[in-house]
């Protein structure tokens, strides 16, 4: 590993400012890059690090295909579903709306009566199941990294999961 050389190395922008647009030998090697370089087939699905779908773009900017972790992945997969792109899915609600469509005035949680695929993490889980079934049929080592959005605001999931807990039995933290 490497120690941070600059305070910018500690921010969420480190991948954008320190890794992207640089030749392979000039950047720190990620674990996934190391595995890939040593014969593993590497697949990333979902939110592996800061950016929601593995590509560098801001919430209100057009989507790009510029990788957040260059040289790390043989495949980087994400299903944005009805939300259209990663950031909209990250802040998405079951009806397909998102933080942007609500002018950033959003409720902190939602529990719609929908299937798992009614929220982005269900789509991510489906991709992961499909991909691991495919990878296990090949005769090569692989690394499958899967990142889910939750827990993160907004706290959204299908109602069946909320119904597993009695709200009154959950203690409220004394620290707000």
Give the role of each language-model region.
Residues 1-176:
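Formylglycine-dependent sulfatase
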